[in-house]
């Protein structure tokens, strides 16, 4: 079966994304990705010039999918920014179920790629920045006195939920995230 270059690129990225997430980026070689995708390493390198390019595409895809999922949850919650914030955490609770969660893809990427000059590192930081900025937008819509402070607090809960789910499971400390978010939101009263 012949594929277009775009189809081959998507196939390689699909396989690489699965392997990178479940087995680790550095632990997954290009030869393994090519074999599982049913392409030669030369074909893989035509789609992605280097493994670093493939990793950057994996991070970009993960970021795009997450942002779309969280934006959809916010939109479904309606115009109330408080409901939007809670919807983001409800979506996160779905994402950290053990059958689909090994850990935060961006945090795992940052652990494996600490060099700030690498596109994968920059993409992972960008994803984390987006979450904080999204919380900032919603906090601003709430009309609280210090939306940046609320955004930071929500980001800390977000990251804590991700990391404790990875270490202790979704039924451990992450099960308290929504209650903690509700308490934080109750503490930050609108200034208007």
Name each region found by the language model:
Residues 55-62, 69:
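Alpha-helical DNA-contacting segments of helix-turn-helix folds
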Residues 146-165, 176-183:
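Hydrophobic alpha-helical segments that form the core
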Residues 9-10, 30, 52, 56, ...:
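Short, structured helix-loop boundary elements
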Residues 57, 71-100, 151-154:
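Hydrophobic alpha-helical connector segments
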Residues 64-67, 83-86, 116-141, 152, ...:
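Amphipathic alpha-helical packing segments from all-alpha helical-bundle domains
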Residues 83, 98-118:
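Amphipathic alpha-helical segments used for helix-helix packing
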Residues 1-7, 189-192:
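N-terminal intrinsically disordered/low-complexity leader segments
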Residues 11, 15-53, 57:
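Helix-turn-helix
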């Amino acid at each position: 079966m012949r594929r277009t270059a775009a189809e081959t690129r998507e196939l390689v990225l699909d396989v690489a994304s699965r392997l990178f997430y479940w087995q680790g980026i550095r632990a997954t070689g290009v030869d393994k990705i090519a074999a599982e995708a049913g392409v030669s390493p030369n074909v893989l390198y035509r789609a992605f010039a280097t493994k670093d390019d493939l990793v950057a595409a994996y991070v970009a895809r993960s970021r795009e999918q997450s942002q779309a999922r969280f934006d959809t949850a916010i939109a479904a919650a309606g115009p109330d920014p408080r409901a939007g914030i809670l919807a983001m955490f409800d979506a996160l609770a779905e994402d950290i179920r053990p059958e689909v969660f090994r850990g935060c893809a961006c945090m795992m990427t940052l652990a494996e790629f600490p060099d700030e000059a690498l596109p994968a590192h920059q993409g992972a930081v960008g994803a984390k920045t987006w979450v904080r900025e999204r919380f900032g937008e919603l906090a601003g819509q709430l009309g609280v006195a210090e939306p940046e402070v609320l955004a930071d607090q929500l980001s800390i809960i977000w990251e804590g939920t991700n990391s404790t789910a990875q270490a202790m499971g979704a039924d451990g400390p992450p099960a308290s995230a929504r209650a903690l978010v509700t308490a934080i939101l109750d503490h930050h009263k609108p200034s208007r």
